[in-house]
Every structure is written in C-alpha cells, then in structure tokens.
Amino acid sequence: MMLLNMNELLKVAKENHFAVGAFNVCDSVLLKTVIETAEANNAPVIVELAPPEVDFVGDEFFQLATERLRNAKVPAVLHLDHGKTVEDCVRAIRNGFTSVMIDGSELSYEENIALTQRVVEIAHAVNVSVEAEIGTIGAMSDSVEGGVENITYTKPEEVEDFSQRTGLDSLAIAIGTAHGIYPTGFVPELKLEVLDAIHQLTPDLPLVLHGGSSNKDEEIHQACLRGINKVNIASDYRKAFFSQL
C-alpha cells in the first residue's frame, strides 16, 4: 500500500460513510501492534503521536515508523496529534509526517484562525494535510493529548466560517467526549444533535472525534453515521497494554 496524507484517506471515508481509527503510539511495540492489527482486519489506519510522545521517542524513531507505514498492507497515515505551535507542526513535517493537527482551541476564535491559516500555508506547500479544532475537548485525567476541565461545545455556526477562512482539511469538534479514562460509574453522553447541526452546515467536511475511549459503541457508531470520519483512540488500548506488563 502506501503512506497517504490524511485528506486522501478521509475523502474516501467521507464518500463511503465510515470512520478511520487513529491510535496514539509511544514506542515501537505499540506501533507494531497498531499496524499489524489494522492489516489483520484489512482496515486503513492512522498512527498518531502528540508532541510529548514525539519528544519521548525522538526524531530517529520516525525513520522506522515511516518505513514501516510505507510497507503496510493497508492505507496508512502518520499524523501529529494536538500540535500547539507552528514549530510542533514543522518538526513533524520534517520527520515525514503526512498530516498534522494544529490545536488552537484554547485561543480566541480569531487567534485560532490565524494560527491555523499559518500551519495550512506551510503544510499544504508540501502536500501535508491539516486538522484543526474548535470547541474544547474535556480531560478526565492527565493525558499527553491535553484537554480542559470544562468542555466548550463546538458552535455549529462557526464551523463553516472557520473552515472557509483557514482552508483546513478536517476538523475536530467538541460534542461531549474527554481525553483519558472515565471514572468508574461515569457514563459519557455525546451531543449528537450538535454533530447533526454541524454536518448539515458542512456536509463535505471530514469531522474528527477525539476522546473516543470508553464511549458506548452504539454512540460511536451513530456519530460515524452522522459525519464523523476519524475517531481517536488511546486510553482504552493503552490501559489494556499496560495491564499486561
């Protein structure tokens, strides 16, 4: 197969009404696990790392990662998760990432637009796709992906304006999920009506669901049917991995 930019992969997902799993890795074991599981299921895959994970593995790791992904038996993407600065994104691009996320969601709306525009300008010049975020994802525990204590839901009326002004390729939206492991007894509930409103206004824009761990399978399924084309998963499978060490 080949190492694609995410725009190419999510375009197919959008046209065929499915979502691609995106899995955070922080070492060669998790990288191997994610790729081999995707191959065993004949499923496309997005391998992603947040900046703290990039720091942990070091730049030399990405020669291995890009080579393995180029030779994967399924379509694959190497994606930067929750880059906070232009420098985060440039480092990823130089290391062979085919997609980057610039997360300016905690900035003002106009500052977020300006930051996203700058990253889009740089990334698109070298055929790298860009994910951005409006609204804020929650955080249930310390996580490399970040998050905030109080979720700010994405405003549907802002999505079309943000997309047109930035030229982004995909958008992470906040509809009630959180990064990390949910406390025992806590049952998250997605605001699917917010997703419906966003999808109605921007039907061609690939939408991304962060904090996918521990949500009900049926809710995730419904979200995918209603316009989500990328689902981020980290905490669930990391918990299973570390429980066996």
Regions found by a protein language model. Give the residues of each.
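Basic/polar N-terminal segments that are highly enriched at the extreme N-terminus
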Residues: 1-4
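Alpha/beta enzyme core
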Residues: 6-12, 16, 26-52, 59-77, ...
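Conserved phosphate/anionic-ligand binding catalytic regions in large, soluble enzymes, centered on
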Residues: 23
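Active-site neighborhood of phospho(di)ester-bond hydrolases with catalytic His/Asp-centered motifs
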Residues: 207-209
